[in-house]
Amino acid sequence: MIAEMLTCIALNVYYEARSEPLEGQYAVAHVVLNRVADDKFPNDACKVVYQGLEKGIGRCQFSWYCDGKSDTPRERRAWLDSQLVAHKVV
């Protein structure tokens, strides 16, 4: 369960902020955690990251998930950095 949560947060950091400085990457990770803590959002990091598509309206909380492209990270260094950020915030 924790591994899945870390992967979801890391994917979100990767796709939303991989070209940003570390501060921006941490901010994206904290957005997910803040939403998990908010009653208006699901209480699960993966459900927060993937929220929206299930309603069939094509609008997700994070646009990379609804863009129709592969969700497999291609930039190794950026993916490793995103995983590190996820581990540090959790």
Regions found by a protein language model. Give the residues of each.
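Bacterial extracytoplasmic/cell-wall-associated proteins, especially those involved in peptidoglycan
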Residues: I2-V90
